[in-house]
Amino acid sequence: MTMRWFYYAAPQTFYGLAGRLWPWLAALALALTLAGLWVGFALAPADAQQGEGYRIIFVHVPVSWMSMVIYLAMAFWAVLGLTFNTRLSGMMTRALAPTGAMFAFLSLWTGALWGKPMWGTWWVGDARLSSELILFFLYLGYMALTSAIDDVRRADRAGALIAIVGAINVPIIYFSVKWWNTLHQGASVSLTRSPSMAQLMLWGMLLMALAMWAYTLAIVCYRVRTLIIERERHTDWVQALPEVAGAKA
């Protein structure tokens, strides 16, 4: 099993695998998004306290989850890259960062839209909001640093350090509502207690979360293929690819 993981860690092998996966994942993401939006915005009942305004939860919560999950995935690939010096690890980390930054921005934006009618202001110095903003800046810092260093291997190592050190912010985001007295509500879904929302609300949120997962996997597979061609362009196997050979013709 371990040897099979190392087999797919080779850029040449992963290129083919990602090419087979990303169209199916993209189609799945589209289907799940349409289903989630239908359940969340058309079928789910209005909230007893927040009325119709709560429906932004079907976007806000899934993108917030993914902004944290993606950063942890970046830290995982960063550790793998520093430990085993695998070429694919740096590419995976770079491919994840733009999507993570997008989700962090959407989390902050939808949170502001939700917070305005609930709290009467677009922004408060809340522990969860502030730590999510820090996460967004960590993504931007990672992308800026790796883009500023010309040597790819050095850029990957420098970026890996940001990804690993910055990962400490993720549990701070998650536990902030428990550690401090914040305006932000607690966890929308908990594994230790029964759901407090209507079943249709829960299903809408879970469908959207699965859609965000599928989208992330699809776009990362697509982006990694581009990075592989860019970094391995001098190898014989890349030169032999139909898409590369056709572009040169």
List each model region and its residues.
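Polytopic transmembrane helical bundles with strong interfacial aromatic enrichment
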Residues: 2-249
